[in-house]
């Protein structure tokens, strides 16, 4: 009798967890889609702020997007991330592609790492523009180009948000890719059994 009650309880738990599983997957899919869609306007704004950013100074000349190579890298990474985010959002709702979790996992991981390098490079550029580097005789430029520096700082802030979104997306896609597999067995448990 007692074994029968335990079996009934286990069946109830397993049936309720099976009912909750599609709801959890749907809410995860919605969060994933929202994050991916949020990347697009932030990346486009980063590109626009960086490319249209220019300022002239009568003493030092013109400073624009083409003057600093690291900004071209940031713009390129932003463009790639915006295009990928849009395409992956569309693909997320195509049933035959959703079952292929690796199609999302690998690019999400790669873009998270590439975004990290881009943010690091852009942060260094903004730091050098603000503080300079006396050892290599690079003077700070933000006192001469204040509008340029403030616009670039805003672009960097947006780029950092995109990085955080991609880091979170890489965790979600890793969960999707690896959740079908069983956890590794504990050798201590196997010995006791």
Swiss-Prot record:
<comment type="similarity">
    <text>Belongs to the Casparian strip membrane proteins (CASP) family.</text>
</comment>
<keyword id="KW-0472">Membrane</keyword>
<keyword id="KW-0812">Transmembrane</keyword>
<feature type="region of interest" description="Disordered">
    <location>
        <begin position="1"/>
        <end position="24"/>
    </location>
</feature>
<feature type="topological domain" description="Extracellular">
    <location>
        <begin position="133"/>
        <end position="151"/>
    </location>
</feature>
<protein>
    <recommendedName>
        <fullName>CASP-like protein 2D1</fullName>
    </recommendedName>
</protein>
<feature type="topological domain" description="Extracellular">
    <location>
        <begin position="51"/>
        <end position="73"/>
    </location>
</feature>
<dbReference type="InterPro" id="IPR006702">
    <property type="entry name" value="CASP_dom"/>
</dbReference>
<feature type="transmembrane region" description="Helical">
    <location>
        <begin position="74"/>
        <end position="94"/>
    </location>
</feature>
<comment type="subunit">
    <text>Homodimer and heterodimers.</text>
</comment>
<feature type="topological domain" description="Cytoplasmic">
    <location>
        <begin position="95"/>
        <end position="109"/>
    </location>
</feature>
<feature type="transmembrane region" description="Helical">
    <location>
        <begin position="152"/>
        <end position="172"/>
    </location>
</feature>
<dbReference type="GO" id="GO:0005886">
    <property type="term" value="C:plasma membrane"/>
</dbReference>
<keyword id="KW-1133">Transmembrane helix</keyword>
<dbReference type="Pfam" id="PF04535">
    <property type="entry name" value="CASP_dom"/>
</dbReference>
<feature type="transmembrane region" description="Helical">
    <location>
        <begin position="110"/>
        <end position="132"/>
    </location>
</feature>
<feature type="topological domain" description="Cytoplasmic">
    <location>
        <begin position="173"/>
        <end position="193"/>
    </location>
</feature>
<keyword id="KW-1003">Cell membrane</keyword>
<feature type="transmembrane region" description="Helical">
    <location>
        <begin position="30"/>
        <end position="50"/>
    </location>
</feature>
<feature type="topological domain" description="Cytoplasmic">
    <location>
        <begin position="1"/>
        <end position="29"/>
    </location>
</feature>
<dbReference type="InterPro" id="IPR006459">
    <property type="entry name" value="CASP/CASPL"/>
</dbReference>
